């Protein structure tokens, strides 16, 4: 009796269902794909808008093959990828995996399927295929991007999870584009279908995302990658800038004592703030606004009269901004206060920036946004100079910025406060020509109580994790170890194209740089890069964990790029002096955030 044939020799030459090679299937595909006509049948769906996408159902020929592939994947090491753009788990490229069925699948894509794909799509391909497996758990996502990089020509996804539904999240969302070719809204969503292959040509408008997974007891499993081909000529027009609406200081005179906790406008306290800003480029001042005023503002923010407008483009940002003409009266006064020369003067005193015009050539200005945030909102890492010059509008970074860090809450001695109070009636922090009338002492304010709060805040911060994240660091190696850029580079170690998903966000860095060289570069940048001052006030954040949805200031090209974490805190005034190449990134808001929160963000320019 002859010996039984080895299992590897029993395998079919391909694991793909035969029906895709039939004349009828290929005629059907050709008629609808190339004529941009929609069709949906048992084994095929073609979507023509916003860009052409094909889904083939029952793609692998048997359930046994699918089970073998999934079993082999269980033994493949995954890594956790976390960045502003994405959060999920991923294997290395299958070119480096030698298990039986995964190797067969990879070889089939590299040979038979490449030939078939090139023939039916008329897209020129070579034999290079990038392939890996991804797994998305609860709160994982991959935000808006176009895959349009290098020699990628056709993107594909093979779905491995059974019984997936729309209520589980994780859909493949397709974006339409505006008149500038930038992503706008999700107009089509494909629910992951077990044993289906979805593919589309990588083009200038192939913007898509993996929506956040919201199932707590399921994982979204897939095999994905790209077919590669010759480089195409770049035909995309330059990416338009997002132009802020710059506002010059209004000659309105504001009585700050109506709004601000009094100690923060005492000259001695102002001087202390200035020292801290000069040293650390950052401050976080607690209980900055009067409690009753802050509470009324918080209520006003929930008014149905406010008109909110979503802002994009989706590959840069997704949140809502208030129409200032629709704000309730008190909130409108508060909003407009930040345009006033009074606030410009106060911020000049806090920072010594040239925010008050003293000559005709000086032109201080500001921009302001009242933002509403909820589940699904985000901003992404994007370099200003790259957006101005790049035809592709890639999210790559080219600038160096100086190290910045935080300010601990002010601690002022009792004696100094008494001295300040005695001199307060005759001395104003504002210049005589540009600011409101001098502010006088107010016996209604309990100075001792305010100072106790400040000291208590400092004490609590010194024993918290946030203090570690916000305190000044002596070297780059001591910056927050979970910074996005560090994670990306520690996880993405393969040479494979699949492993380079981080290339959407950054250029490779020379990791051999010594700390001294890095610090020298930062010092050089510090003397040459123009700066601006961010002012941040947050509302309705008490329902969130303090470190859950921080606003991060990131140097995109620095090895450990996160410089500052701004925690979510109500009634705090945050000041950050930043260089213009610094990116302000607000973390993606997951489905566990069930209420709105608000940011008033102003940026002041000398």
Spans of features found by a protein language model:
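Fe(II)/2-oxoglutarate oxygenase catalytic core
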Residues: 2-606
């Amino acid at each position: 009796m002859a010996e039984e044939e080895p299992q590897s020799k029993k395998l079919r030459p391909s694991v793909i269902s035969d029906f895709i090679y039939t004349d009828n299937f290929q005629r059907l595909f050709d008629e609808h794909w190339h004529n941009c006509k929609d069709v949906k049948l048992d084994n095929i769906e073609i979507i023509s808008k916003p860009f052409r996408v094909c889904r083939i159902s029952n793609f692998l020929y048997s359930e046994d093959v699918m089970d073998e592939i999934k079993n082999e994947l269980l033994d493949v090491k995954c890594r956790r990828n976390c960045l502003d753009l994405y959060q999920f788990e991923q294997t290395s490229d299958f070119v480096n995996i030698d298990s039986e069925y995964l190797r067969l699948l990879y070889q089939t894509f590299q040979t038979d399927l490449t030939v078939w794909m090139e023939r039916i799509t008329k897209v020129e391909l070579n034999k290079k295929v990038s392939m890996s497996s991804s797994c998305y758990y609860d709160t994982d996502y991959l935000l808006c991007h176009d895959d349009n990089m290098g020699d990628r020509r056709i993107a594909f996804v093979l779905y491995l999870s059974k019984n997936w539904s729309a209520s589980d999240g994780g859909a493949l969302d397709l974006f339409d584009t505006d008149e500038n070719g930038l992503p706008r809204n999700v107009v089509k969503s494909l629910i992951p279908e077990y044993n289906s292959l979805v593919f589309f040509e990588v083009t200038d408008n192939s913007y898509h995302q993996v929506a956040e997974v919201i199932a707590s007891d399921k994982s979204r499993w897939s095999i994905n990658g790209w077919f590669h081909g010759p480089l195409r000529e770049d035909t995309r027009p330059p990416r338009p800038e997002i132009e802020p609406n710059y506002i010059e200081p209004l000659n309105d005179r504001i009585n700050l004592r109506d709004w601000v906790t009094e100690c923060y406008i005492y000259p001695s306290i102002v001087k202390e703030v200035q020292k801290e800003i000069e040293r650390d480029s950052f401050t976080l001042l607690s209980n900055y606004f009067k409690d009753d005023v802050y509470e009324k503002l918080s209520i006003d923010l929930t008014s149905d009269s406010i008109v909110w407008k979503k802002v994009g483009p989706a590959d840069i940002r997704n949140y809502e901004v208030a129409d200032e003409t629709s704000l309730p009266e008190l909130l409108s006064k508060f909003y407009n206060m930040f345009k006033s020369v009074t606030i410009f003067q106060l911020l000049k005193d806090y920072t010594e920036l040239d925010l008050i015009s003293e000559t005709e050539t000086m032109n201080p200005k500001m921009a302001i946004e009242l933002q509403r945030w909820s589940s699904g909102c985000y901003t992404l890492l994007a370099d200003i100079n790259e957006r101005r010059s790049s035809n592709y509008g890639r999210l790559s970074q080219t600038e160096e910025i100086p190290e910045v860090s935080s300010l601990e809450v002010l601690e002022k001695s009792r004696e100094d406060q008494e001295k300040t109070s005695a001199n307060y009636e005759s001395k104003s922090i504002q210049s005589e020509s540009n600011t409101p009338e001098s502010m006088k002492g107010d016996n209604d304010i309990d100075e001792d109580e305010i100072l106790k709060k400040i000291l208590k805040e400092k004490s609590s911060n010194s024993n918290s994790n946030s203090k570690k994240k916000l305190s000044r660091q002596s070297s780059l190696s001591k910056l927050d170890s979970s910074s996005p850029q560090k994670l990306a580079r520690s996880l993405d170690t393969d040479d494979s194209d699949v492993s380079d998903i981080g290339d959407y966000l950054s250029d490779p860095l020379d990791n051999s740089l010594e700390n001294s060289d890095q610090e020298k570069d930062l010092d050089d940048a510090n003397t040459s890069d123009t700066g601006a001052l961010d002012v941040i006030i947050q509302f309705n954040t008490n329902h969130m964990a303090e470190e859950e949805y921080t606003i991060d200031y990131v140097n995109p090209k620095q090895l450990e790029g996160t410089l500052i974490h701004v925690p979510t805190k109500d009634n705090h005034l945050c000041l950050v002096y930043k260089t213009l190449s610094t990116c302000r990134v607000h973390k993606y808001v997951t489905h566990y955030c069930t209420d709105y929160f608000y940011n008033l963000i102003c940026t002041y320019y000398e």
